[in-house]
Amino acid sequence: MEISLLQAFALGIIAFIAGLDMFNGLTHMHRPVVLGPLVGLVLGDLHTGILTGGTLELVWMGLAPLAGAQPPNVIIGTIVGTAFAITTGVKPDVAVGVAVPFAVAVQMGITFLFSVMSGVMSRCDLATNPRRI
């Protein structure tokens, strides 16, 4: 099965909304148990989406960002893992082997981005100082 451009766009919108939820709303739409069925619905295989989302939820159930430790990015991991399971027809436990490396790699990128942005924030604070004008 191939993913159409419209389906890829819909998955991107789902990832965007889930990312907003993860950092702002915390309605838990970013959890795999919710994202898996949504990906399955978009790709036309709700059953595999539910099974893969549930399996990935078991993998990431107890992970929480505490202090400086950041867990793998569950959003990208779930979307990539579920899409992989649906498009290739593999079992959900095989999708875990694909989802986890993607989740770790994306979280490393996000941590790097946040580290770079921390240096920019002091410059932004200086630029908004009204006495500087």
Swiss-Prot record:
The keyword Transport applies. Keywords: Cell inner membrane, Cell membrane, Membrane, Phosphotransferase system, Sugar transport, Transmembrane, Transmembrane helix, Transport. It is found in: Cell inner membrane. InterPro entries: PTS_IIC_man. PROSITE patterns: PTS_EIIC_TYPE_4 (PS51106). Its main location: membrane. It is a multi-pass membrane protein. The chain crosses the membrane at residues 3-23, 33-53, 66-86, 94-114. GO terms for cellular component: plasma membrane. Pfam families: EII-Sor. The phosphoenolpyruvate-dependent sugar phosphotransferase system (PTS), a major carbohydrate active -transport system, catalyzes the phosphorylation of incoming sugar substrates concomitant with their translocation across the cell membrane. This system is involved in N-acetylgalactosamine transport. The EIIC domain forms the PTS system translocation channel and contains the specific substrate-binding site. This is Putative N-acetylgalactosamine permease IIC component 2. It comes from Escherichia coli (strain K12).
